[in-house]
Structures are given as C-alpha cells and as structure tokens.
Design a protein with these regions (language model features):
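ATP-grasp fold ATP-binding core
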Residues: 82-89
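Short, internal active-site loops enriched in acidic
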Residues: 90-95
Length: 173
C-alpha cells in the first residue's frame, strides 16, 4: 500500500493518454456496532471485471483478490466513518492505443462527505449534449473516458445557472 500522495501514473500511460481506466465507486457504511459494511461489494467487483473484459484488459484478478485489496485499504486507512472507495484498473504501459497490458490496480478509501441535493430541490437543464450510445462507448461500463460526456453536460448546466444536466439519447428520449 502506497500513501495517496506518493501514488503516480506516467503521463504517457494508456490510462492518461487514452482514458484506458475502468473503476467502481463503492460505499461502505458504519454500522451501530462500529464496523464498516461495504455495500454490494461482490456486485461492484463483478461489474469491474466485466468492464475490464470489455476494455480487453489482460489481467486475472479474482473477486477474492479484489475483495482483499479493498479490505486491506480500508484497514490501512483506519476509517471509522461512512467511506467512499474508488477501485480503479488502468493500462500502465506507455504503449500505443491498442495496449492491453500491463494493468495496474489502484484503490482509494476516504471518508464520505456527501454534497447531495437530497435535502433541496435541484434545478436541471436538458443538455444540448447527447448521452453516449452503447454501440460507441458503452456507458454500462465505468470507463473514465465515458465520463467526459457527463462532464461537458454538467459544465454547460452550471455555466447556465443550473444544478444538474439531463442527457437525452440521440433519439431525444
């Protein structure tokens, strides 16, 4: 385990140059007995494995190994509060666009401080940006590159004075 501030990824890696990163955002909640319980960890890890498969990442991490990584990082950070975990797999090589290995794994666990809009009404704007299509860049996988779509829509909405953006498919639905 490397401290967050010491973790590095080369600027010419596939992860940085091409957005070849997949991840899961996972929540852990502090129970009445003072123990953290990770919400639907097996499901998150299976989706991460699916994302890596679709992105053709060459790796053989089992759900058991990934569970151990998450557990070890939570313990190392000595967290005793609701926690956000970000487990990422990324192309580490400085190779070309088609690089599928080596793959590195990063896991960050930090206290969860929601800035949720649940306690107030949100003002939303239908964006001029369209939701990406599954046949182009599958939004069902959590690939960092896919988030540029929502990022552009959010920037537009906030610039225009709204809290959130609503993205419609190309068909307008």
């Amino acid at each position: 385990i490397v401290p967050e501030r010491e973790a590095t990824v080369h600027v010419l890696s596939g992860a940085v140059k091409y957005g070849a990163t997949v991840f899961e955002g996972i929540c852990a909640y502090l129970g009445d007995e003072g123990r953290l319980t990770v919400f639907r960890l097996p499901e998150h890890l299976l989706r991460l494995q699916d994302s890596m498969r679709i992105m053709r990442f060459e790796q053989d991490w089992s759900v058991s190994h990934l569970t151990e990584v998450v557990t070890d990082v939570i313990k190392a950070n000595e967290l005793h509060e609701d926690t956000h975990i970000r487990l990422s797999a990324y192309v580490l090589s400085e190779g070309f666009l088609d690089a599928t290995a080596p793959i590195a794994l990063g896991c960050l666990a930090v206290g969860r401080h929601d800035k949720s809009l649940s306690d107030k009404a949100a003002r939303a704007q239908v964006s001029s940006w369209h939701r990406i299509e599954d046949s182009s860049m599958p939004p069902r996988i959590k690939c960092s590159a896919n988030y540029q779509n929502g990022r552009l829509a959010t920037i537009q909405a906030r610039t225009d004075g709204y809290d959130e953006a609503i993205l419609l498919a190309g068909s307008g639905k």
